[in-house]
Amino acid sequence: MAEHVRVKGRIIVGLTENIKLISSEGLNEEVVAKVDTGATKSSIDTRLAKKLKLGPVIKSKMIKSAHGNQLRPIIEAEILLAGKKIKTEFSLADRNHMKYKMLIGVNILKEGFLVDPAKK
């Protein structure tokens, strides 16, 4: 993984980042995630979550998306982003038709990250 620069204690990330999903089953997987400052909650593809045996579903929540409002299952999962381990909530969504199987939202970014769109 590339070296991440810090500014005033915050880690600089780009519009896409390599993420390691950490499964309690030991089925960890690295994926490229899209960073989305307009998304309140992070999201994982339903099939990827099932493959890694992530879960259980802790609640359901109404999520606003480009496709309108959707009631989505919410799980708690752990990731490694830029060397920082974070455990937080993710909504499950069908992202199979999308380029990125994971979306990093504000709930993760507020854990000490800044987004630089020019960062490669």
What name fits each language-model region?
Residues M1-K120:
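Pepsin/retropepsin-fold aspartyl endopeptidases
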